[in-house]
């Protein structure tokens, strides 16, 4: 087939193979630019990017990775000219986005990268406007709040953003911690599962307002019940009983005066109307029970639950 094509185009097989190699070359340019950034070969990376842009000025992967190279060089050397070049290239990459095959890169990720470059250039107003324009679902509240808090005359403006970011960050932390606990349990690493749950409990304790009952108490009861279940499964009945008593006491306190108000969370200073909810059970006691029993709870386990004294 190659010989037939060569005859058709009146060229040698070597020339045709060379064309195929050039077509593959643009795909390897991006990987080479990444490697040069990882090894901090800045001059070589910039030179490679300039050469690649002349050959492939409208290839997404080349334009995008060249932008990242100029961004890295500008950040390392505090060179605003390089940062401006990175900004221009990212803008061009946005227009070439239909060529992109990397699911980790999107219109949003490009815009956020541009906002980061504006921050590096100390163009705070433009960076702030870019972040606010792309803050779907409050995804960027933490970045916006952090930026505003760094501007002396705008610090109070940051509070609402920081408050919502605190709640979202806490939610993420709990999910990640519980996810790791499940992984450790499946591996048979009970100690690590217990430790990460205890770490979450320590974080929650630091966010409780003294004298107030709130959703963090319900979540804490669930986490303590999870620790009880781990102790029970590992055969440490005394520790399981102790943790279960703690979980029941906390759950009973919450159920006596349930509150979902975010205002019960320490450091939160956002809107009074914001509420937070846990995902298990209508009551804290029910949620603790579900957590302790799991999906394969036995009658013996239920008897153990019932045998732990419920607070009067």
How would you name each of these model-derived features?
Residues 1-17:
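Hydrophobic micro-packing sites on short alpha-helices
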Residues 18, 49-61, 92-107, 128-133, ...:
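Flexible helix-coil transition and linker loops at the boundaries of alpha-helical arrays
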Residues 26-61, 65, 69-79, 113, ...:
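Alpha-helical segment of the N-proximal tetratricopeptide repeat
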Residues 31, 65, 69-72, 106, ...:
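"A position-specific structural signal for the A-helix of alpha-solenoid helical repeats
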Residues 35-49, 77-95, 115-125, 148-160, ...:
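Helix-turn-helix repeat elements of alpha-solenoid scaffolds
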Residues 61, 109, 139, 175, ...:
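Residue register of alpha-helical TPR repeats
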Residues 67, 72-78, 101, 149-153, ...:
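Short coil/turn linking the two alpha-helices of tandem helical-hairpin repeats
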Residues 190-312:
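Eukaryotic alpha-helical solenoid repeat scaffolds
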């Amino acid at each position: 087939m190659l010989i037939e094509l060569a005859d058709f185009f009146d060229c040698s097989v070597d020339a045709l193979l060379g064309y195929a190699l050039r077509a593959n070359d643009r795909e390897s340019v991006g990987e080479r630019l990444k490697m040069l950034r990882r090894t901090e070969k800045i001059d070589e990376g910039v030179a490679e990017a300039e050469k690649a842009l002349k050959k492939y000025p409208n290839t997404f992967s080349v334009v995008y990775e060249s932008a990242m190279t100029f961004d890295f060089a500008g950040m390392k050397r505090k060179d605003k000219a390089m940062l401006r070049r990175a900004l221009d290239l990212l803008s061009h990459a946005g227009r070439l986005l239909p060529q992109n095959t990397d699911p980790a890169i999107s219109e949003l990720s490009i815009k956020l990268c541009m906002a980061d470059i504006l921050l590096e250039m100390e163009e705070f107003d433009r960076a702030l406007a870019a972040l606010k324009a792309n803050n779907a679902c409050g995804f960027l509240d933490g970045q916006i709040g952090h930026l505003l808090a760094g501007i002396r005359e705008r610090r109070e403006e940051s509070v609402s953003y920081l408050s919502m970011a605190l709640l979202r960050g806490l939610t993420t932390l709990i999910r990640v911690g519980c996810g790791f606990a499940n992984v450790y349990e499946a591996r048979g690493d009970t100690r690590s599962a217990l430790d990460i749950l205890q770490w979450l409990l320590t974080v929650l304790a630091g966010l409780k307002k003294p004298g107030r009952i709130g959703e963090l108490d319900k979540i804490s009861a669930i986490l303590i019940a999870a620790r009880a279940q781990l102790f029970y499964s590992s055969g440490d009945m005394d520790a399981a009983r102790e943790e279960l008593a703690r979980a029941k006491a906390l759950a009973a306190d919450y159920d006596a005066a349930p509150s979902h108000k975010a205002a019960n969370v320490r450091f939160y200073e956002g809107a009074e109307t914001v509420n937070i909810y846990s995902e298990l059970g209508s009551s804290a006691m029910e949620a603790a029970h579900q957590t302790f029993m799991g999906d394969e709870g036995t009658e013996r386990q239920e008897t153990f639950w019932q045998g732990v004294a419920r607070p009067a």
